[in-house]
Amino acid sequence: MNLDKIFHLKENHTDVKTEIMAGVTSFMTMAYILAVNPNILSAAGMDHGAVFSATAIASFLGTLCMALFANYPFALAPGMGLNAYFAYTVVLGMGYSWQVALAAVLAEGLIFILLSLFNVREAIFNAIPFNLKKAVSVGIGLFIAFIGLQNAKIVIGGSTLVGLFSLKGYNETLAEGLTASMSDAGITVLLAVIGVIITAVLVVKNIKGNILWGILITWGLGVICQFAGLYVPNPDLGFYSLLPDFSNGISIPSLAPIFCKFSLDGVPLLEFAVIIFAFLVVDIFDTIGTLIGVASKADMLDKDGKLPRIKGALMADAIGTTAGAMLGTSTVTTFVESASGVSEGGRTGLTSLTTAVLFLLSLLLSPVFLAIPSFATAPALIVVGFYMVGAVSDIDFKDPGQGIPAFVCIAAMPFFYSISEGISMGVISYVAVNAVTGKAKKISPIMYVLALLFILKYIFM
């Protein structure tokens, strides 16, 4: 096989060794999703092992499409923020089944294929004001970090709606009248806090795969605590053994519990459309923003600041999302962690092909990834939130017409525990504030349509 001819290595001033090493680097920085995504989606009632398999296979397919359709070194996987919206907003917040949420993801993927074919996706993206785009990223970052703090039990419910975990008199009532005491939960909170510190140090030191290493080290400390008797497994209380279960050998968890399990039972058409739209908007921001941002670091943009072959890259994302929904996972999107592979010299689809193969091989290590607890992945959520909140520096808060809608969008996501509410309120407030202050003609017609749809949602839902 002539890899140079397929991926145009010489034309892109790279070689096979550089591309493969870059692909390995991208995988190392993204592999945390194999542990985090099952933990998040299982909160919605989905089978933990099946979600792991779906995550690995969907990541493989999406990244492979990127290599073949666009020849870019970008990798794809179920997106952070989108998985949180799936589990914590659509299912736990709005009360719909995960089968309904999967149906929305499938619909989004099919719509994306059409939008990518007819270049509508770029038009929607361009219609949203720059500051509001950045606000969506910041709001999702806060939302993800908040979920991480909750998963770690650092933030708990209380008389003030949310409160800080207390070492004194801790007592948590679980399902069916079971109660977790300080001796049960205290060690996991401590390990999560240590995990945040360790991951932060790795980020500051710019260690490759810092998020994945943070998860593994935190998990390792938990295993040590289990051997020392400080962490006592008790499945009835939700504290499972931290040791990988190889009793059945190396086996790949079945997709059967979640494969092609779609439902529209009990969901009003307008509300289903809003759910789909929220997936669409966030994925649009995620994908195009990541593509342009990472490509600019690799000098892949043309003289007009546009990315050649972007249609192929967007199509890979759309196909990845559609395939992912059928497999049983949330929206697949291009990962900003692809920048790590680019920084290692990755310039072609051979980098993403390498990453794709590693995602497929990860299926053989399912007992390892499935043994990683939520207190070990919580620091990853918090640090990913930190990365996303960094976009706040790009928002023009000196202009109230831009800053106020951006702030509303940011604040609404964690406070209302919903990404879609943040987008809705951000769009409505932007149109309202600017339309009545003499800037009505500067607002895109698409924004007026979106604002009207969101207002109708609040009136009739």
Region spans (language model):
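Helix-loop-helix junctions within the multi-pass membrane cores of secondary transporters/permeases
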Residues: N2-N37, A58, G79-Y88, L92-I140, ...
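Membrane-embedded alpha-helical modules
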Residues: M94-I217, L353-M461
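Juxtamembrane transmembrane-helix boundary signature
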Residues: S59-M80, I111
